[in-house]
A protein has these predicted regions:
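Tubulin/FtsZ superfamily GTPase core signature
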Residues: 1-276
Length: 276
């Protein structure tokens, strides 16, 4: 069985942001992001499942706990995945010890590897003084009560080790997009994770007319706790109002009231012909 510790970092320009997909759900989301593209970030997969790593197009990969799981996955056991991540802690540190200033850790909570390993990776990143943002999903109801309970425990654990945590409730997506098929439901979850990571990362990596940089993002997110974010789009007449209304009704908000937020960061994208 081949061991995977593959750090093929691009050499064209330094990238201070990493997006790490942990486990099956996180890996699917990062595969999707990699294909869609996010400007100037490095994508990474961490998994106990050697086969899933081999099948991914993402070039930077780390197999967790090779002696514990022997590349066969965590068997839906978060405690086994935690042990695997701890065994690979030095490799995780090496992965991050290259000038990384911000890391997004994305995982589907409720299974084994994402639920167990993501909090360990988050803890290591935070201990290295890297701005650490968790973006995780809670399962659909049809995935079963055990998985949901396991997911909530995982959310509680990762919340202790991140600067900011975005929790996306998959069941909320199903309520909003009621016509989704079984497979499209998981695809919509991947889309939502991708939008969340892309929206924050490209505030830093894409220069704007009124520029926001890493320091601005760090001020908002550092030790921010549970966070919510949203995106909205508008076109034609009253497009600004339409975009705001769209953002306020995004599934990313999970019915949360944004008006009690302690910090807010607003980023607006517009065409050159837009009037003030």
């Amino acid at each position: 069985m081949d061991d995977i510790v593959q750090f093929d970092f691009p050499t064209d320009s330094p990238k201070i942001i990493k997006v790490i997909g942990v486990g099956g759900g996180g890996g699917n989301a990062v595969n999707h992001m990699y294909r869609e593209g996010i400007h100037d970030v490095t994508f990474v997969l961490c998994n106990t499942d050697n086969q899933a790593l081999k099948e991914s197009p993402v070039p930077v990969k780390l197999q967790l706990g090779r002696s514990i799981t022997e590349g066969l996955g965590a068997g839906n056991r978060p405690e086994r995945a935690r042990e695997a991540a701890e065994e690979s802690s030095e490799e995780i540190k090496s992965l991050l010890n290259d000038g990384t200033k911000m890391v997004f850790i994305t995982a589907g909570m409720g299974g084994g590897t994402g639920t167990g390993a993501a909090p360990v990776i988050a803890r290591i990143a935070k201990e290295m003084d890297i701005l650490t943002v968790g973006i995780v999903t809670i399962p659909f109801i049809f995935e079963g009560e055990k998985k949901i309970i396991q997911a909530l425990d995982g959310v509680e654990r990762i919340a202790q080790h991140v600067d900011a945590l975005l929790v996306i409730n998959n069941e909320r997506l199903r309520e909003i997009y009621s016509d989704l098929t079984f497979m499209n439901a998981f695809g919509k979850a991947d889309d939502t994770l991708s939008i969340a990571a892309k929206s924050i990362a490209e505030i830093i990596t894409m220069r704007g007319t009124v520029n926001l940089d890493f320091a601005d993002v760090k001020t908002i997110l550092k030790d921010g706790g549970v966070a919510i974010m949203s995106t909205g789009f508008g076109e034609g007449e009253s497009r600004v109002t339409k975009a705001i209304d769209d953002a306020l009704h995004s599934p990313l908000l999970n019915n949360n009231d944004i008006f009690n937020a302690k910090k807010v960061m607003l980023n607006v994208s517009f065409c050159e012909s837009s009037e003030l």
